[in-house]
Amino acid sequence: MILVKNQAGLRDLYELVSRSHIEFFGNRKPRIPKSLLNEKRKNLLIASSASAVFGNNGELANMFIRGSDLEDIEERAKFYDYIEIHPMTNYVDLEGTGDIESLDKIVEMNNYFYDLGKKLGKIVVATGDAHYLEEREAVNRSVLILGSGMGRRIFSYDKRLFFRTTEEMLEEFSYLGEDKAYEVVVENTHK
């Protein structure tokens, strides 16, 4: 996830997107090398991207789920300006495919990332990874993805990427405790 800080950052982001499609396109996806991202990061905010679902590559989340050494995860986390965590229901496909034994692994991961953010002095932000506004719109997204030939998603896994209210997000992160949930859902999203 890349956010812009200002107009110069927007110009830098446009350049990164253009170059990713022209110079670094591969395996049906545009890519931005970290070396190029480092050159342009002055006016950007770079997040860890918590997504490790449906073939997306959230670097830190993938490392944690695959059992990488925590020191390696910590070292990689230093690259990012802030750390994202997603609702555990966003990861039901990993449980359904056997990549994780239960959603308890996601609770463990999100708690670890919260503590890691504190240790490294990085903001931890809860994001919903919303791909559509209403929960009932999941079927529309699945039709688009499956019809485009880009995915082999099982529809039953793709029902929780809707835009959640603050109350719904606080409930999703209630396992962190009331104060921590409020911090990552409300306070840190405004910093």
Task: Locate each region found by the language model.
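Phosphodiester-processing cores and adjacent nucleic acid-binding clamps
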Residues: 1-191
